[in-house]
């Protein structure tokens, strides 16, 4: 049910109730009117019937009383209704006032009081009107008030109902009562009328009239009531709408207010959060500022100390150094420390006494050890031991002077007075003044002797001291009296020193335990040698031609030395490179056991160990000791420590190498240059500081002068100067003598190192801030240069930067980025003071000697524990006989051997805190570890050696060595059979006995020398089958027996009066019994090959002019079987001479006259070459312009070229591994062509010789060498060939004019003469673009370049001579490279 419907029901209920009450009132009024109407009739009829009036009078009076009571009751009901109406009106107003939230409570109370008063007044007024009206009917005003009261009563009931359901029930009950009441009323009214009718006879008439009147009145009242109800309902609806709107507005305002309050609350919360965050940030910022301020203060103090140290180091004058030291010593006093000196005596030389320091907490410190201990305990880092001084050289702090009292002279009781620095300085000044004043003998008239003078009473220190009192106080008597107590003082000093020693002994802290090097597989000495090899290779490998990317690192090197299969090959390659370099320089001696020195042999995989042994034997006693293990086994089979020692020895030998010495000299020059740069910057900084201080002083003088001028201007002009102002010194003006001025002018214009101390005009005109900035920049540059000096110095030499109590060295190396600590086992091998034999007579190596390899995995700490147990037993036995007792170890066993590293900077701090300040070694190390610049250079970390996994199978390596040796013997025998050096066999055909055509040069054993990949520990391509050593030895001797005696060199040839050659027999004995390893047998086999004169063989003939076998055609002498290229003659020989041909040497021997080896003429000015002993003409041996020849030092051009070619050949053999010969796996007995290109070429050469013989041409007269030809080279190989030729051309000394294209601006007319310019740069660009398809295309451009040179330049010009020399080199070298690449291509095609 809605609010409107409920209001309508309430109004209807109120109207029904009001109607019922009206009916009741009308009935009562009708009764009253009847009563009033009957009273006059009775009075008029009373005269006629007087006798019967008595009973009627009594009835009338009773009816009047009832009417009065009914009127009073009606009036009371009206008054009650009016009161209820007033109460309802007050309640409604009160609710309206409560709904208005914007009105104040005080106004609400006043309105409630006013409403209550108005209601009471209305009730009184209504009562008075009702009581005053004696009319029996209702007035319209009362009727309207009554209607309003009835309505307000219904409204009050509606408002007082708490719930909706209860209100509906109440409405239903009231409706039912309204329906029942009219019937009851009607019955009562009818009863009353019926009862009253018998009373009078006229009542029926009156009642009918009254009923009509009552009906009319009731109808009128109903109409008025319904009008009032409609108007009231309309007003109520309007009021409800207003209230609803008002409530909606209030709810909206309340929501807006709530939102606004919520927003305000959120804003407040945000503000509170921001304030809280701000407070927290402010607190954190304050805390951070305090921390930063604390750090800044500590940094400032440290900077101040560091600046004082630096100023002390940089100060040139002693005065500045003294001031700086004094400032450093005053720093603790500024921080709250006290320095107190107990004075024993004062003289002109200074103060003597005992110095003590008092910390801020009050603790007294009397020695350096106590100070250091206190600083370490309290973590004070901004001051150090250097800020304290326990002698009295400087007058700093407080001074306590003892004095004697005059009260009791016998007991010599002493009191003390406190003196300040100023007092002591005044006294010292007085004594120094008195020292130079002539002494005046004191008057003795008073009878007092000088010795009897007593020391006067010392006044308070605040008062000025009287010089006479001080003179009396510190007289010679005081000194004399103190002499008596010198003995006591000396005893106290000794006791104090003993106490200090005891304190130091008791407070000795154990050094921290550093981390050992992980997976240590070498002994201490072995790791030391490996570390030295690693540093040497990393430092000088780039100048020795060692590839540092391939070279093993320290971890891999140690594992490879221990025999790890994964790293053994890298170690073997490094060993080979070091040995090869050592053989080149410093080389070996000239001792030759079998006619051939070790340096003359090639270095290959098999003779490696024996060549190394021969090299070590040649290097003195140390080398002989290292070579002993190689006498019975190969290099790979010796112990890791022996390998490391040999590698270290090779590095020591290479230090004297030319390249290493040059690198060291270059580094020394670089250090000298850097020191000069640093000195110049420091000198410039000193000059700037001096100029800055001078400018600052000048500015101060100018300010003082301006102030003086201002004061003088303010004074009267007639006033004379006072003596005080007259004594004021004018601005300081340095008087410069003419000599010094001339020197300064000369320094300004004289360049050199002194120039850095001379400022330019621009520098002198700088401001103080600019000077400070420039000084800072110079200081930073000096520090950077100092770092470079340090890094460069590490490349030259490395020294340990400190030693501790265990004699352990601390290393900082250039290429090991960790601090390494070396133990006693390697640092003090030759130091008798800490000899390991004195500490422990027998160390664990004895166990290793008994059981080899059993102690390899024993940890060093375990060894130390075992040694401790052994030491206890030894010490117990030593106590038996004190006379024979020996001094045993004072060093802990676990510190004796091994290597350690520092993990981080905390290790430095812990190490520094545990060091002894009085230790000889640790004091220096501690001083260095406290310097910040040194700590910044240290690098920390750990080193872990690669774990040793599977080791190489040495037995398999040994078997493969014998297999390779057997292969080499087969190769040599095959080569002997294919040449005419071996003895003839019965199966040789007649045409094979004749001289065949010469084949390309190939040495049999050279085929064993493979590229770098062949240097493997275990070669998978080599069969490791077991061979009988006796058979191998016998096979080598049989190979020697195959050589014809005429091909032996003189050392292996027997003399005419002897049956055998003794050297040859010694060689056989060496092969049979003495040689114990495959390497030694390989050297013997190479010696055998070297003793054969291969050049006497027609197939191995060398050109006597160019000393090579490369060439197109070669003529072989029919007398000595030596060969000469046809192209080497001057002029060039184009045809093969008919008949027998003899070389120049055979002709000279026959005729006895010298002959030119080029042109074969005897005439002309001949010169003998000091190298090849041939006679040549100058014009034949030299191309281009002729130079003056010194006969004593003359060397022909071919010999000079041969020397250069040998050097180039060595370079090629190092870099070009493919140019070496491959092995021949097939045997020559099978009759098949071998895989080697030389053997194929040999068969082809024999076939050519047979064909020429069948054609009737003499094979012994025509010695032609055909270059092996094959199809065109691949593009990559062609490019590589051209690139190699270009690289060799560029490095030549005469290649400078041909490196770049000719500039037409610099050389006018060049393009007019040369139509097709060409240079090496253009050729290189074309080669990189793969323009050259064949080598001939490349050679055409090279020839074009030299043709242009000959066309534009004359032969005698500098460029002409350079072109001729370079062209000649190109022609020879190009043939060799083409031949090598052709052979390589043939091997690829097989």
Curated annotation (Swiss-Prot):
Residues 1273-1377 form the Bromo domain. SUPFAM superfamilies: Bromodomain (SSF47370), DNA-binding domain (SSF54171), FYVE/PHD zinc finger (SSF57903). Disruption phenotype: RNAi-mediated knockdown prevents age-related decline in the expression of bas-1, a serotonin (5-HT) and dopamine synthesizing enzyme (DOPA decarboxylase). RNAi-mediated knockdown improves behavioral performance in pharyngeal pumping in aged worms. The keyword Kinase does not apply. GO terms for molecular function: DNA binding; zinc ion binding. Residues 323-395 form the MBD domain. A zinc finger (PHD-type) spans 1100-1149. Residues 243-269, 705-724 have a biased composition (Basic and acidic residues). SMART domains: BROMO, DDT, MBD, PHD. It comes from the Eukaryota. Its main location: nucleus. Broadly expressed in the nervous system, including head, body and tail neurons. Residues 30-67, 178-215, 235-269, 705-729, 1218-1241 are annotated as: Disordered. It is found in: Nucleus; Chromosome. Residues 35-45 have a biased composition (Polar residues). Residues 46-63, 186-215 have a biased composition (Low complexity). One of its GO terms (cellular component) is chromatin. Residues 524-588 form the DDT domain. The keyword Cell membrane does not apply. GO terms for biological process: epigenetic regulation of gene expression. Keywords: Bromodomain, Chromosome, Metal-binding, Nucleus, Transcription, Transcription regulation, Zinc, Zinc-finger. Belongs to the WAL family. Interacts with set-6. Chromatin reader protein, involved in positively modulating the rate of age-related behavioral deterioration. Positively modulates the level of global trimethylated 'Lys-9' of histone H3 (H3K9me3), but not of H3K9me2 or H3K9me1. May repress the expression of mitochondrial function-related genes by occupying their promoter regions, working in concert with histone methyltransferase, set-6. Involved in modulation of the mitochondrial unfolded protein response (UPR). Negatively regulates expression of bas-1, a serotonin (5-HT) and dopamine synthesizing enzyme (DOPA decarboxylase), with aging. This is Bromodomain adjacent to zinc finger domain protein 2.
């Amino acid at each position: 049910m809605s609010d409107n419907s409920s209001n309508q029901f309430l109004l209807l209920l109120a109207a029904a109730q009001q109607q019922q009450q009206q009916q009741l009132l009308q009935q009562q009024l009708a009764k009253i009117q009847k009563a009033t109407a009957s009273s006059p009739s009775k009075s008029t009829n009373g005269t006629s019937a007087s006798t019967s009036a008595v009973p009627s009078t009594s009835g009338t009076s009773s009816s009047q009383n009832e009417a009065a009571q009914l009127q009073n009751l009606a009036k009371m009901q009206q008054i009650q209704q009016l009161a209820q109406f007033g109460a309802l009106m007050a309640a409604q107003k009160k609710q309206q006032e409560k709904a208005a939230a914007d009105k104040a409570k005080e106004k609400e109370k006043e309105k409630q009081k006013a409403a209550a008063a108005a209601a009471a007044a209305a009730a009184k007024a209504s009562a008075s009107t009702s009581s005053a009206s004696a009319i029996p009917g209702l007035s319209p005003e009362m009727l309207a008030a009554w209607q309003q009261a009835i309505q307000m009563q219904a409204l009050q009931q509606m408002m007082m109902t708490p719930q909706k359901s209860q209100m509906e029930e109440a409405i239903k009950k009231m409706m039912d009562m309204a329906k029942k009441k009219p019937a009851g009323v009607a019955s009562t009214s009818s009863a009353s009328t019926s009862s009253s009718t018998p009373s009078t006879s006229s009542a029926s008439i009156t009642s009918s009239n009254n009923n009509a009147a009552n009906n009319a009145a009731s109808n009128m009242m109903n109409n008025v009531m319904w009008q009032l109800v409609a108007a009231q309902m309309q007003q109520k609806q309007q009021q409800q709408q207003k209230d609803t709107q008002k409530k909606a507005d209030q709810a909206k305002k309340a929501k807006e207010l709530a939102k606004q309050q919520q927003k305000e609350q959120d804003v407040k919360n945000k503000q509170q959060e921001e304030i809280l965050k701000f407070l927290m940030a402010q607190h954190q910022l304050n805390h951070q500022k305090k921390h930063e301020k604390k750090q800044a203060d500590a940094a400032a103090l440290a900077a101040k100390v560091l600046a004082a140290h630096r100023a002390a180091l940089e100060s040139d004058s002693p005065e500045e150094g003294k001031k700086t030291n004094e400032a450093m010593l005053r720093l603790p006093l500024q921080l709250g420390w006290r320095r107190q000196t107990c004075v024993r005596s004062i003289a002109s030389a200074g103060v003597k006494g005992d110095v003590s320091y008092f910390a801020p907490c009050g603790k007294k410190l009397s020695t350096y050890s106590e100070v250091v201990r206190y600083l370490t305990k309290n973590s004070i880092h901004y001051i150090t031991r250097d800020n304290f001084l326990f002698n009295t050289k400087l007058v700093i702090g407080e001074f306590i002077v003892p004095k004697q009292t005059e009260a009791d002279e016998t007991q010599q009781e002493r009191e003390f007075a406190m003196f300040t620095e100023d007092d002591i300085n005044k006294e010292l000044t007085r004594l120094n003044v008195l020292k130079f004043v002539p002494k005046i003998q004191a008057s003795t008239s008073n009878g007092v002797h000088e010795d009897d003078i007593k020391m006067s009473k010392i006044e308070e220190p605040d008062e000025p001291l009287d010089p006479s009192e001080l003179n009396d106080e510190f007289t010679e008597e005081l000194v004399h009296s103190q002499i008596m107590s010198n003995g006591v003082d000396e005893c106290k000093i000794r006791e104090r020193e003993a106490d200090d020693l005891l304190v130091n002994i008791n407070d000795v802290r154990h050094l921290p335990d550093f981390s050992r090097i992980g997976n240590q597989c070498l002994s201490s000495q072995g790791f030391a040698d490996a570390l030295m090899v690693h540093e040497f290779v990393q430092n000088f490998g780039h100048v020795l031609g060692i590839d540092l990317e391939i070279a093993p690192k320290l971890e891999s090197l140690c594992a490879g030395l221990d025999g790890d299969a994964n790293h053994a090959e890298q170690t073997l390659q490094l060993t080979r490179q070091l040995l090869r370099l050592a053989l080149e320089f410093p080389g070996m001696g000239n001792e030759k056991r079998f006619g051939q020195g070790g340096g003359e042999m090639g270095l290959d995989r098999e003779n490696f160990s024996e060549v190394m042994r021969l090299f070590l034997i040649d290097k003195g006693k140390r080398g002989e000791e290292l070579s002993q293990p190689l006498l019975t086994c190969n290099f790979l089979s010796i112990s890791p420590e022996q390998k490391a020692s040999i590698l270290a020895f090779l590095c020591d030998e290479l230090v004297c190498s030319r390249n290493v010495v040059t690198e060291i000299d270059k580094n020394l020059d670089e250090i000298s240059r850097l020191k000069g740069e640093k000195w110049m910057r420091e000198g410039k900084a000193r000059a700037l500081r001096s100029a800055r201080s001078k400018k600052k002083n000048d500015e101060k003088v100018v300010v003082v002068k301006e102030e003086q001028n201002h004061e003088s201007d303010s004074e009267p002009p007639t006033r004379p100067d006072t003596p005080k102002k007259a004594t004021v010194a004018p601005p300081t003006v340095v008087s410069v003598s003419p000599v010094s001025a001339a020197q300064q002018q000369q320094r300004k214009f004289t360049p050199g190192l002194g120039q850095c101390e001379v400022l330019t005009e621009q520098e002198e005109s700088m401001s103080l801030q600019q000077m400070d900035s420039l000084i800072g920049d110079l200081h930073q540059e000096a520090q950077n240069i100092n770092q470079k000096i340090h890094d460069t110095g590490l490349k030259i030499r490395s020294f340990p930067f400190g030693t501790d109590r265990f004699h352990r060295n601390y290393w900082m190396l250039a290429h090991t980025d960790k601090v390494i600590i070396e133990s006693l086992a390697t640092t003090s091998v030759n130091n008798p003071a800490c000899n390991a034999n004195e500490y422990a007579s027998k160390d664990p190596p004895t166990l290793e000697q008994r059981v080899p390899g059993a102690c390899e995995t024993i940890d060093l700490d375990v060894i130390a524990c075992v040694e401790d147990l052994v030491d206890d037993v030894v010490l117990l036995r030593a106590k038996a006989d004190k006379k024979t007792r020996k001094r045993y170890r004072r060093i802990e066993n676990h510190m004796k051997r091994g290597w350690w590293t520092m993990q981080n900077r905390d290790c430095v701090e812990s190490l520094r805190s545990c060091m002894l300040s009085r230790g000889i070694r640790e004091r220096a190390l501690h001083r260095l570890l406290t310097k910040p610049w040194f700590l910044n250079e240290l690098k920390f970390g750990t080193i872990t050696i690669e774990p040793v996994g599977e080791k190489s199978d040495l037995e398999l390596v040994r078997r493969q060595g014998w297999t390779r040796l057997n292969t080499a013997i087969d190769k040599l025998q095959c080569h002997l059979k294919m040449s005419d050096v071996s003895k003839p066999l019965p199966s040789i055909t007649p045409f094979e006995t004749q001289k065949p055509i010469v084949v390309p040069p190939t040495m049999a054993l050279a085929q064993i020398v493979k590229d770098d990949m062949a240097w493997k520990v275990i070669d998978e391509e080599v069969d490791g089958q077991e061979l009988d050593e006796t058979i191998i030895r016998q096979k080598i001797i049989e190979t020697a027996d195959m050589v014809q005696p005429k091909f032996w060199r003189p050392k292996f040839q027997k003399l005419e009066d002897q049956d055998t050659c003794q050297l040859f027999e010694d060689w056989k004995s060496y092969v049979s019994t003495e040689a114990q390893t495959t390497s030694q047998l390989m050297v013997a086999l190479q010696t055998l090959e070297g003793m054969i004169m291969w050049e006497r063989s027609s197939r191995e003939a060398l050109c006597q002019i160019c000393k090579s076998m490369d060439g197109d055609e070669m003529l072989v002498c029919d007398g000595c079987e030596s060969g000469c290229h046809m192209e080497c003659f001057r002029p060039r020989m184009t045809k093969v001479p008919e008949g027998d041909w003899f070389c120049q040497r055979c002709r000279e021997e026959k005729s006895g006259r010298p002959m030119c080896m080029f042109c074969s003429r005897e005439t002309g000015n001949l010169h003998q070459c000091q190298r090849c002993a041939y006679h040549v003409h100058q014009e034949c041996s030299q191309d281009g312009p002729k130079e003056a020849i010194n006969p004593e030092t003359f060397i022909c051009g071919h010999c000079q070229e041969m020397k250069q070619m040998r050097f180039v050949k060595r370079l090629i053999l190092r870099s070009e591994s493919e140019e070496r010969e491959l092995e021949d796996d097939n045997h020559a007995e099978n009759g098949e062509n071998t895989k080697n290109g030389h053997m194929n070429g040999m068969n082809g050469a024999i076939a050519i010789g047979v064909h020429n013989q069948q054609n009737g041409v003499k094979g012994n007269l025509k010695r032609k060498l055909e270059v092996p030809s094959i199809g065109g080279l691949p593009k990559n190989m062609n490019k590589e060939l051209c690139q190699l030729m270009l690289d060799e051309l560029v490095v030549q000394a005469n290649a400078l004019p041909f490196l770049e294209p000719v500039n037409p601006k610099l050389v006018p007319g060049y393009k007019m003469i040369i139509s097709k310019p060409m240079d090496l740069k253009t050729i290189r660009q074309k080669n990189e673009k793969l323009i050259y398809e064949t080598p001939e295309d490349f050679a055409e451009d090279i020839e074009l370049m030299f043709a242009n040179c000959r066309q534009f330049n004359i032969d005698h010009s500098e460029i002409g001579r350079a072109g001729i020399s370079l062209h000649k080199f190109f022609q020879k070298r190009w043939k060799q490279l083409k031949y090598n690449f052709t052979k390589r291509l043939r091997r690829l095609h097989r």
